[in-house]
Amino acid sequence: MSDTGTTTDGRVERGNQTRRLVLGRTMDIASVEGLDGLSLGRIATELRLSKSGVFALFGSKEELQLSTIRAAAAVFAENVVAPLKDAPPGARRVRALCRNWLTYSSERVFSGGCFFYAVSAEFDARTGPVHDAVARARHDWTEYVERSFAEARAAGDFDADLDVEQSAFEVIALMEAANAQSVLFGEMRAYERAERGITARLRASATDRGLAGLDAGDEAA
């Protein structure tokens, strides 16, 4: 029984390693070429794996695409959201969240910049499970930014009449514009412009308490 269990555990771990290897490659491909650039055969060839083995792990191109989206969401959360899990609500935290996003894009965690910006343009006018998964990831991020603004407002860092949905829309637009310009033209200045615009937007709606937090963040940086 113990030998059988050890053998099974070994196979499971090898399967998990192969899955991580495949998804690492598919995330990079999709960020540059789109999710339609993925296929079981291509991945098997590029990674020198058996096509039957890749098929056993994913079963179809659509499942490979969906798994890639889920993996990318985990990478995004690890780089952008997780570093702030212990940070108190406030204007300083909102700006740090935006800075994390700009760093995630500018440091090319994915080869094509922001994974979700790239695949959203590919699937925004389509229907089906892949479109729905992309839309859900985008919605979750927007909702998270809105909630961060709302929590900062409740903490007294922003004016009581702050429109959190509008504020989130504006800072996300600046971040995505920086990503698009940098990826297209291969330059980094767009990220500096985006950060200046975001900071100006936050300061325009910040209370004295919020301004103090933003100023303290500048000194810490």
Task: State each model region's role.
Residues 92, 132-138, 154-170, 189, ...:
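All-alpha amphipathic helical-bundle segments outside canonical DNA-binding/catalytic cores
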Residues 1-7, 96-103, 139-155, 174, ...:
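C-terminal peripheral helix-coil segments that are non-catalytic and often amphipathic
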Residues 58, 63-72:
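Alpha-helical DNA-contacting segments of helix-turn-helix folds
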Residues 67, 81-112, 164-171:
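Hydrophobic alpha-helical connector segments
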Residues 112, 117, 160-181, 197-200:
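Hydrophobic alpha-helical segments that form the core
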Residues 47-58:
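Short hydrophobic/aromatic patch on the recognition helix
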Residues 93, 107-129:
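Amphipathic alpha-helical segments used for helix-helix packing
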Residues 1-33, 37-46, 63-66:
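Basic, helix-initiating cap at the start of DNA-binding domains
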